[in-house]
Amino acid sequence: MLIGIRISEVWFGVITLFPEMLKSVTDFGVVGKAIKQSSIEVCTWNPRDYATDNYRTVDDRPYGGGPGMLMKVGPLEAALNAAKSVAPAGSKVVYLSPQGRRLDQALARSALSVPGLILLCGRYEGIDERLIEDEVDEEWSLGDFVLSGGEIAAMAIIDSVSRLAPGVLGHNESAEQDSFENSLLDCPHYTRPEIYRDKRVPEVLLSGNHEKIRRWRLEQSLLRTLQRRPDLLEQRELSEEEAQIIQELRRGQLISET
């Protein structure tokens, strides 16, 4: 666990498989100096420390097939509970995801209004959707590009928020501008167990019907993009199938999960 001296200005908890990565921001520069001066505090929790098997397994295969692995809910939930037990009351849990609200100066400044941030760093293909639904308050993103994990985003958030805290800098600095690629947001993902907190994995992902699974994932992807980032659709050349699904969504037709 990486710990600075506990103070009330800015508190960060980071759930990560690679806590050592955080040293590149906590040991150097503005953030490192602020930690030494007790202006901010950064703590980390590693889900591997909460795995229950001898191999300290933290990932599993996704239901419905597909490439890659998902982070298991058990170790993540235990790490989150450990973080919450020491976080200031009223802290927010933020999942670092390309589907989230884009980080900008206004969002960084708004973080100063909450007692603390617990930053959840994904790896592999992401984390089980049910944990996001039950435990995450907000999703934040650096932009429309893919990273290998949430650690770089966590470091960017720690740096951008810390520099706005009283006494850390003498003045505010402008946020860097990012350039983006047009893409659709991802669909929900699920891994074992099949039932978690009385929530079942969508039946279509258990069907073994690859065409139905492909269609469901496309529908969910388009729905999320339409709801969360409609600007991406304006810049995207839709296929005939995508255009048809968008029309159905805009007419208010429900997407089947079976």
UniProtKB/Swiss-Prot annotation:
Gene Ontology CC entries for this record: cytosol
Binding site for S-adenosyl-L-methionine: 122, 142-147
Tagged with keyword ATP-binding: no
UniProt keyword annotations, A-Z: Cytoplasm, Methyltransferase, S-adenosyl-L-methionine, Transferase, tRNA processing
Subunit structure: Homodimer.
PANTHER family: TRNA (GUANINE-N(1)-)-METHYLTRANSFERASE
UniProt protein name: tRNA (guanine-N(1)-)-methyltransferase
Organism: Hahella chejuensis (strain KCTC 2396)
